[in-house]
Amino acid sequence: MRISFAIASTAKRFVHRSLVVRGNAATVSPSFSFFWRRAFSGKTSYDYREKLSRNGLSELKLDDAVALFGEMVKSRPFPSIIEFSKLLSAIAKMNKFDVVISLGEQMQNLGIPHNHYTYSILINCFCRRSQLPLALAVLGKMMKLGYEPNIVTLSSLLNGYCHSKRISEAVALVDQMFVTGYQPNTVTFNTLIHGLFLHNKASEAMALIDRMVAKGCQPDLVTYGVVVNGLCKRGDTDLAFNLLNKMEQGKLEPGVLIYNTIIDGLCKYKHMDDALNLFKEMETKGIRPNVVTYSSLISCLCNYGRWSDASRLLSDMIERKINPDVFTFSALIDAFVKEGKLVEAEKLYDEMVKRSIDPSIVTYSSLINGFCMHDRLDEAKQMFEFMVSKHCFPDVVTYNTLIKGFCKYKRVEEGMEVFREMSQRGLVGNTVTYNILIQGLFQAGDCDMAQEIFKEMVSDGVPPNIMTYNTLLDGLCKNGKLEKAMVVFEYLQRSKMEPTIYTYNIMIEGMCKAGKVEDGWDLFCNLSLKGVKPDVVAYNTMISGFCRKGSKEEADALFKEMKEDGTLPNSGCYNTLIRARLRDGDREASAELIKEMRSCGFAGDASTIGLVTNMLHDGRLDKSFLDMLS
């Protein structure tokens, strides 16, 4: 029965053209050009028929396949179209779709007519290359020549629709298959189910399984694998479990792939214990875990800080002679680094190298981070240079890690050198890169360079975020440049970016420390109008400002308001008020505050104890105050 398709207008423009844009096959790629020249130069000593045998095709490499094509088109008479289709199919299985398309063009140029099979292969290749209009054009030409597409051809086209984000047309295609007498097979249904999950249509995908069964097409392991994978990626692990039980109750036995998918989904959605239970369950059922199973569990355990459990799993997999891969080692190394166990991380790295497993960029970046955290910056730089020598080129994350290390330990100039080196390698720093540098330069007291880097960031098209502005404002305020900070703050308020409570706290503190307590108080009072609730830092900053100004009553009133507002005072609030009372000579009020502070679980800080000690020496206080603070 002939099926009628509405070929899109974009495809119709291609129908009269040849299979691909005209041109020499050598234009496909430099490597293909070499293979092509080889195919038509010199004589070969083998018979193409021998190479086209089943065993010959299974061992065929791309350059040999192209050379074989050259031999075939030189033969007279031409080999049969069936033999050409065998070769094109073999190359398509290598995922060399461009090569297949180009060879198909050459066949047409040489007058070798395509048939149903070669057209189907070409449609599949165009779809796999996300060139759906060209696939539709080939379909149109194929049908014009009287060839009816079969279910394999239509399944390829279906895949093209799914990957071209034309999912409604994909669904319509399957519906039309039924109407016109085609019987979609498992591959067809699996393709559409996968496409539906790709486009967040999980309910439609699940409903399609029931429709599939109703049409007499039983789901296979691939079907369940696609569905389980789709559900787990959405976090629907309960539904995935239900499907697993359904499989076990039926004739299908879920293998390690299905279990791995669910375990990985459970890990990603923080159901660690469920993942471990499923791991035990698969073992009791005789399903042997593989490196993927262990790697998922180890990575998840590491993310939870359960590095000892992760280490036990690593030992377990080695005992079972399941070789850990770079992903397994990298996850553990990163976990040890974050736990501050750099020695253990280095031992794992040595073990990895001993096993001839090439470290990845993640492995190197984790170790560089570890060295930076422990102020072993020279070793971090050596590791950085070593990874480059191994042709494992650092990305922006690696550079950021090293730059942050140098800035943290006051070696900002070296951090700047790394930043410039990154630019020379053609990598553009991201927002995090610039934030690190701006903060490092301010901490080093180089306000001018910090501002220059901010300007460079904007001119390079790297978008500042609220953290950038907070860093800039904090640096300017702490370096006594309140007026410049005010200009930046006013610009920020006019922009679409929302200042956070941290932003306001920076400005309130900057104003108070610059003696502009009233300005700080105005900004504090306006917080509620901006929809921002003051936090304990905001209250403490303002209380400290009032105390510094000598406005004792305002400080007391704000302290009372703070508690009434439901914001619990912290150690800083109490110590600030205690010191203010002691300086005013109000020993009774300070003693009451000390008792209240101690009842809340806080103790005197270094500044308060230092003040009390000095007053003891001066004879202005007795020892009982020091005892109360201890």
From Swiss-Prot:
The keyword 4Fe-4S belongs to this UniProt entry's keyword annotation: no
What Pfam families does the database record attribute to this sequence? PPR_2
PPR repeats span 44-79, 80-114, 115-149, 150-184, 185-219, 220-254, 255-289, 290-324, 325-359, 360-394, 395-429, 430-464, 465-499, 500-534, 535-569, 570-604
Q: What GO biological process term is on the record, naming one?
A: RNA 5'-end processing
Q: Which segment is the transit peptide?
A: 1-22
Q: Does the keyword Repeat apply?
A: yes
For this chain, the family text in UniProt reads: Belongs to the PPR family. P subfamily.
Q: What is this protein called?
A: Pentatricopeptide repeat-containing protein At1g62670, mitochondrial
Q: What is the lineage of its organism?
A: Eukaryota, Viridiplantae, Streptophyta, Embryophyta, Tracheophyta
